[in-house]
């Protein structure tokens, strides 16, 4: 059994269940170990994903939610939909490239009771995202999500690069930064 501490990349502290104490959200997805320049990253590991650990109020944390996200690297936590609870947005630097639509970004809308509804972005925006931030970039009072591109061609299988170029319709030139503007609907 693989412990969730393996491949830990980031964590966030927030009250995900609304009980007044701080819970912990952990990102596991480090796939750099064993990677060799010019070779595809090894297959995703079973511990990769997003975990939320509920605080019982006495600083005992129990895993209450898990979402598999191959190669997860970073996350931001905020009440993006304005409903009073904390949502999660996360990126993967090492997604499962063999999928028809590799998941490189996920937004997990908190539905309460430690249940989250996953949403993603259009496939023409799939890319090797290595940074994520939350900020009101257009000044409308709602927190948006900003994704930053990493230039790591050695991490992407050659056949997927060809498919990615065709999907994008821009000759494979993903934007360096994209803004996911909050429309106030989650």
Residue ranges and their predicted role:
Residues 1-186:
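Beta-propeller-forming repeat regions
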